[in-house]
C-alpha cells in the first residue's frame, strides 16, 4: 500500500491556519477522502512539555534566549511523538494528513533568530534532521497563508481580548515577529510553498474565499 499525502497549512500568528485546516479536512471527509487533521504543537500531549516551557518563558523571556537549534529540537520531539502515537500508521496506510503547522513552522520562526546568510544552512540541517534522521514524512504541499502584519497584530489583540499578558514569548516580541515575517517570505520563495494572500487592503478576506483557494491547491496534490 502506498503512503498517504501530507498537506501543511503554514502562516504567522493571526493568519487563520487552524480554521482553514479544519475546513479543508471537513471538506475532504465529506468527499469520502480518508483524512486526519493534526496540529502542532500538540499541547494535549506530554511530548510538548519543553515547547510549553519555552513559550512560557521558562528558558528566558525573549525568543533569542534559546538558540534556533535547541528550540527546533523541542518541536521536533513533539512531532516525532505525535507521528509515532497518533497519525503515523494512518499516513503509512494511505491516509491524508492536514497539518496546522509542521516542520515548516520551525523553518520560519527559528530562521528569524539567525543572520540571513545562515538561513539556507539552517534549513538544510532542519529538514535533514526531521525527515531523514527522525524519519518524519516531508510535506507534499505547503500552503502559506500570507497576512499583512498590521492586520495580524490586530487579530492577535482581539484573540486575547486586549490582554497582552496572555501572549507567549513570540507574540510579545514585535521585532521578532517582524523578523519571522521576513523569514516566512524567504521560505515561501526558497522552498516553493504555495502562497494564499489572505488580506485585501487593511482587512482579512472572507474565510470562504480563502478556503476556496486552499481547496484548489489541495486538489493539485490529491488529484
PLM feature segments, named:
Residues 12:
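P-loop (Walker A) phosphate-binding loop of NTP-binding proteins
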Residues 2-6:
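Pre-Walker A (Motif I) flank of P-loop NTPase domains
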Residues 31-128, 132-134:
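ATP-dependent small-molecule kinase phosphotransfer cores
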Residues 20:
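Hydrophobic positions on the alpha1 helix immediately C-terminal to the Walker A/P-loop
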Residues 104-182:
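A glycine- and Lys/Arg-enriched "phosphate-lid" helix/loop adjacent to the NTP-binding pocket
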Residues 17:
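Conserved lysine of the Walker
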Residues 9:
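Hydrophobic anchor at the beta1->P-loop junction of P-loop NTPases
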Amino acid at each position: 500500500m502506498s503512503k498517504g499525502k501530507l498537506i501543511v497549512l503554514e502562516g504567522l500568528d493571526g493568519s487563520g491556519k487552524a480554521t482553514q485546516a479544519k475546513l479543508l479536512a471537513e471538506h475532504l471527509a465529506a468527499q469520502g477522502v480518508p483524512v486526519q487533521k493534526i496540529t502542532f504543537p500538540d499541547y494535549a500531549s506530554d511530548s510538548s512539555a519543553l515547547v510549553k516551557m519555552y513559550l512560557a518563558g521558562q528558558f528566558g523571556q525573549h525568543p533569542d534566549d534559546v538558540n534556533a537549534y535547541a528550540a527546533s529540537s523541542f518541536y521536533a520531539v513533539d512531532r516525532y511523538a505525535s507521528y509515532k502515537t497518533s497519525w503515523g500508521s494512518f499516513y503509512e496506510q494511505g491516509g491524508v494528513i492536514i497539518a496546522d503547522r509542521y516542520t515548516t513552522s520551525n523553518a520560519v520562526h527559528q530562521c528569524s533568530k539567525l543572520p540571513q546568510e545562515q538561513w539556507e544552512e539552517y534549513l538544510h540541517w532542519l529538514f535533514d534532521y526531521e525527515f531523514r534522521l527522525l524519519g518524519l514524512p516531508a510535506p507534499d504541499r505547503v500552503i502559506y497563508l500570507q497576512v499583512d502584519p498590521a492586520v495580524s497584530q490586530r487579530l492577535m489583540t482581539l484573540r486575547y481580548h486586549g490582554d497582552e499578558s496572555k501572549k507567549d514569548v513570540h507574540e510579545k516580541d514585535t521585532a521578532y515577529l517582524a523578523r519571522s515575517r521576513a523569514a516566512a517570505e524567504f521560505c515561501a520563495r526558497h522552498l516553493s510553498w504555495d502562497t494564499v494572500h489572505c488580506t485585501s487592503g487593511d482587512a482579512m478576506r472572507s474565510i470562504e474565499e480563502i478556503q476556496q483557494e486552499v481547496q484548489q491547491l489541495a486538489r493539485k496534490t490529491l488529484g
